[in-house]
């Protein structure tokens, strides 16, 4: 070992010595040798990096190209790969099974041919022969309960049910139409009356001594007269009639071109400048007609709880109610509330600037005091009038409009006239 090591060291020393001896002989080659090393190293590095770059770029390009191709063709490639794999595995296994190396092993083991799997299971107990034909699924399920037949039966039953429902609905609609045709337009004018506007049913009883106005007359600025007695008549030439009282028949003319009558036991009718019919009366056949061509200022509600006959459409935004015998009135051009009880009540607003209001107190015998104020082109407010009657009391107040009227006991009538005058 020592000799070998010594020989190797001697050889290396000799080569180094020869190199150094070469450069000692040609010392001018040392700088050139350094230059050569630098050039070779640079060229080698460029070549090396070039190969590396080409390799990397080639792989990158291959990846960039192959990835979208794989994505595009994957629906075909993947099943094809799977099928190829399965097929190759199957064929390979078949070849392996058919290889001559398998049979010698069996023959060497000495397994006789009679106990091979294909011969062990007798034909009689194979699954195909064990299950009899009668209990196979195709024979167990009867034809009547197959899904297709069940669906048909369900559709038939649904169709029958729908036809029955339609027949019942038609019968009901026929019955309703017959009832409605039979029940239209019937009204009774005694204590109990029917209102076509579905204002409700009610009964009212007037006490004796409806109202007695003090005798008097007033002349309006345009020649209208207002006389009030047991049965009063108010007539002014303002384009319509408005009458109200204990047992009155008459009315006064409104600027809306209509006639309005209401009272304890009146027969009369009036036309308002609004759409609908209004009939009111204590225990009367008749009443007032609210027949009009136009509409009141806004939509509203008309209710009569006494024993009125008929009904009307009030386009106003207020409420018209009567709790006692009857009530007739309307609201023109604005909203508000008009209520009356006892015998009768009528009120309205005229197209003129002034206002004609009345305020009265009624005692048990029906004596009345009337007081009214009239102003030109001004808006006044009706104050609340209270009365006592043998049957009922009522209040009337304004809601959202500057007009209104209230009556109790006998009657109170409010109207707005465009002309000057007094009403006593």
Curated annotation (Swiss-Prot):
It is a multi-pass membrane protein. Residues 391-416 have a biased composition (Low complexity). Its main location: other. GO terms for biological process: post-embryonic development; reproductive structure development. The full-length protein is found in the tapetal lipid bodies of immature anthers, the proteolytically cleaved C-terminal product is found on the coats of pollen grains. No expression is detected in other flower organs, siliques or seedlings. Residues 396-415 are annotated as: 4 X 5 AA tandem repeats of S-S-D-G-S. Sequence repeats lie at residues 111-120, 121-130, 131-140, 141-150, 196-202, 203-209, 210-216, 217-223, 241-258, 259-276, 277-294, 301-318, 319-336, 337-354, 396-400, 401-405, 406-410, 411-415. Residues 167-220, 288-304 have a biased composition (Basic and acidic residues). It holds the Pfam family Oleosin. The chain crosses the membrane at residues 16-36, 38-58, 69-89. Residues 164-424 are annotated as: Disordered. Residues 111-150 are annotated as: 4 X 10 AA tandem repeats of I-P-[EV]-S-I-K-P-S-N-[IV]. Residues 38-119 are annotated as: Hydrophobic. Keywords: Lipid droplet, Membrane, Repeat, Transmembrane, Transmembrane helix. Coiled coil: none annotated. GO terms for cellular component: membrane; monolayer-surrounded lipid storage body. Residues 241-354 are annotated as: 6 X 18 AA tandem repeats of [KR]-H-[EG]-[SG]-G-G-[SA]-[PSA]-M-G-G-G-K-H-[GE]-S-[GV]-G. It is found in: Lipid droplet; Membrane. Belongs to the oleosin family. Many of the major pollen coat proteins are derived from endoproteolytic cleavage of oleosin-like proteins. This is Oleosin-B3. The lineage of its organism: Eukaryota, Viridiplantae, Streptophyta, Embryophyta, Tracheophyta.
């Amino acid at each position: 070992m020592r000799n070998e090591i010594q020989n190797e060291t001697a050889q290396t020393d000799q080569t180094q010595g020869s190199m150094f001896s070469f450069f000692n002989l040609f010392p001018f080659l040392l700088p050139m040798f350094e230059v050569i090393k630098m050039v070779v190293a640079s060229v080698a590095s460029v070549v090396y990096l070039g190969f590396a770059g080409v390799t990397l770029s080639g792989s990158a390009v291959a990846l960039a190209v192959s990835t979208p191709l794989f994505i595009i063709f994957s629906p075909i490639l993947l099943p094809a790969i799977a099928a190829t794999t399965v097929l190759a595995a199957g064929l390979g296994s078949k070849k392996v099974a058919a290889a001559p190396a398998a049979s010698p092993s069996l023959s060497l083991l000495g397994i006789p041919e009679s106990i091979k799997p294909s011969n062990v299971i007798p034909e009689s107990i194979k699954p195909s022969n064990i299950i009899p034909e009668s209990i196979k699924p195709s024979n167990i399920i009867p034809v009547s309960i197959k899904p297709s037949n069940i669906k048909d039966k369900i559709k038939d039953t649904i169709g029958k049910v729908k036809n029955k429902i339609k027949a019942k609905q038609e019968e009901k609609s026929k019955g309703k139409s017959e009832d409605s045709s039979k029940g239209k337009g019937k009204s009774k004018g005694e204590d109990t009356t029917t209102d076509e506007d579905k204002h409700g049913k009610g009964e009212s009883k007037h006490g004796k001594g409806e109202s007695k106005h003090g005798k008097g007359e007033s002349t309006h600025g345009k020649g209208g007269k207002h006389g009030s007695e047991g049965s009063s008549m108010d007539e002014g030439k303002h384009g319509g009639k408005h009458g109200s009282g204990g047992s009155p028949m008459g009315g006064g003319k409104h600027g809306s071109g209509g006639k309005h009558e209401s009272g304890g036991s009146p027969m009369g009718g009036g036309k308002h400048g609004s759409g609908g019919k209004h009939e009111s009366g204590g225990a009367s056949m008749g009443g007032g007609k609210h027949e009009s061509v136009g509409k009141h200022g806004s939509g509203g509600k008309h209710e009569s709880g006494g024993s009125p006959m008929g009904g009307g459409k009030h386009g106003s935004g207020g409420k018209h109610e009567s709790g006692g015998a009857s009530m007739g009135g309307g609201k023109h051009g604005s909203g508000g509330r008009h209520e009356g009880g006892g015998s009768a009540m009528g009120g309205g607003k005229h197209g003129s600037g002034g206002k004609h209001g009345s305020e009265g107190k009624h005692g048990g015998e029906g004596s009345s005091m009337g007081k009214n104020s009239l102003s030109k082109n001004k808006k006044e407010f009706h104050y609340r009038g209270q009365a006592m009657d043998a049957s009922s009391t009522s209040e009337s107040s304004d809601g959202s409009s500057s007009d209104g009227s209230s009556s109790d006991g006998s009657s109170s009538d409010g109207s707005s006239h465009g002309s000057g005058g007094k009403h006593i």
